[in-house]
């Protein structure tokens, strides 16, 4: 028989659990600061075509840029309310740790060391990549295993530098790294002939070849990938609410693609769709925004600004973009890829 005291305690716990399940999120310090200043401060690459790059008028574009725009739209209702902070590889983590930026969306690889020791949380993967090599097409090298004793240009302070050393040792290649602090210096040295190869993420190789080579056909990207490079945005530790918001905006973009919600049809789907999942994503049946401390239309605003994940990929990096990259593993889980989002519910 349950005592009166135990009944009271049990009843209180059940009530607390029910309240926790339905209560709105309390705004964290990052969200409060963003709303007060009216901008999301986003750390991006200094210039990587397809991911984050400014034109001559200071207009930013790219996959990483669109992720920040979607977050700003979800949080503030306007994807243009973003302050861009260009950062090199050495600056990016200290800028996040110090509070200079709210989010780092800068082709950064999710690793154990970074996750556990740099005071940051990765919020998901927005591009599954792998490290490769670029060499002159007129040379004899057609495989990374043929780089024995070669000089290879690489940027310091990156997983790329460490992977190069590991690959060389594992295959007894005796590769000679030529290390540069700035990526522009590394690529410039390669195109000037100071190195026999250049290495970075495969997406970065395509970007550099497209943007910097006088004739892109003069350079080939070797077929091997020597590492896994899951790239995605990250936030500071210590603000669970902000971490949850950024994570679920990314998931929402992936979920929107899976259910056919696009930049062009999002408002029509909101008005007429009877699909329970679509209705939850767009806030017509459930106010999921309340759980995040956001407006009911948080995902409507995000999708209206950038489109879904597939649209973001195709526009910036896909086969019809200047980079011309295949969707590959970055396709949805039900289309041969590994992009997968937990349900928005």
Spell out what each predicted region is.
Residues 27-105, 284, 288, 292-299, ...:
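Extracytoplasmic small-molecule ligand-binding "clamshell" domains
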Residues 41-50, 60-75, 109, 129-185, ...:
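Bilobed "Venus flytrap"/periplasmic-binding protein-like clamshell domains
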Residues 2-12:
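Bacterial N-terminal signal peptides that target proteins for export
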Residues 82-94, 177-192:
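Short helix-initiation/N-cap motifs at beta->coil->alpha
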Residues 69, 73, 77, 81-146, ...:
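Acidic, polar ligand-binding/catalytic clefts
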Residues 66-69, 73-75, 138-141, 145, ...:
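Extended ligand-binding regions for polar small-molecule ligands
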Residues 35-39, 72-77, 97-101, 109, ...:
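Sec-exported extracytoplasmic/periplasmic mature domains
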Residues 22-23:
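N-terminal signal peptide c-region/cleavage motif recognized by signal peptidases
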């Amino acid at each position: 028989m349950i005592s009166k005291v135990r009944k009271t305690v049990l009843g209180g716990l059940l009530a607390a659990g029910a309240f926790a399940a339905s209560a709105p999120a309390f705004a964290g310090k990052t969200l409060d600061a963003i709303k007060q200043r009216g901008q999301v401060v986003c750390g991006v690459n200094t210039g990587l075509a397809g991911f984050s790059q400014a034109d001559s008028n200071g207009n930013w574009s790219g996959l990483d840029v669109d992720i920040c725009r979607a977050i700003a739209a979800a949080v503030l209702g306007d994807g243009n309310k973003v302050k861009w902070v260009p950062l090199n590889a050495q600056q990016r983590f200290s800028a996040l740790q110090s509070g200079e930026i709210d989010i780092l969306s800068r082709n950064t690889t999710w690793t154990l060391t970074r996750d556990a020791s740099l005071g940051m949380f990765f919020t998901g993967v927005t591009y599954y990549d792998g490290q490769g090599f670029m060499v002159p097409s007129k040379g004899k090298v057609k495989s990374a295993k043929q780089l024995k004793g070669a000089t290879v240009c690489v940027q310091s302070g990156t997983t790329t530098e460490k992977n190069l050393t590991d690959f060389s040792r594992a295959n007894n290649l005796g590769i000679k790294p030529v290390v540069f602090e700035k990526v522009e210096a590394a690529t410039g040295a390669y195109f000037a002939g100071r190195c026999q190869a250049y290495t970075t993420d495969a997406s970065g190789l395509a970007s550099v070849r497209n943007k910097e080579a006088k004739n892109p056909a003069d350079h080939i990207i070797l077929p091997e990938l020597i590492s896994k490079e899951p790239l995605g945005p990250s936030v500071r530790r210590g603000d669970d609410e902000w971490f949850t918001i950024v994570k679920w905006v990314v998931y929402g973009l992936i979920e929107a693609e899976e259910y056919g919600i696009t930049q062009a049809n999002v408002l029509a789907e909101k008005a007429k769709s009877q699909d329970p999942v679509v209705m939850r994503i767009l806030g017509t049946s459930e106010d999921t925004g309340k759980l995040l401390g956001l407006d009911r239309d948080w995902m409507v605003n995000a999708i209206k600004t950038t489109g879904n994940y597939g649209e973001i990929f195709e526009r910036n990096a896909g086969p019809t973009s200047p980079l011309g990259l295949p969707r590959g593993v970055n396709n949805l889980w039900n289309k041969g890829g590994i992009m997968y989002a937990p349900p928005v519910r």
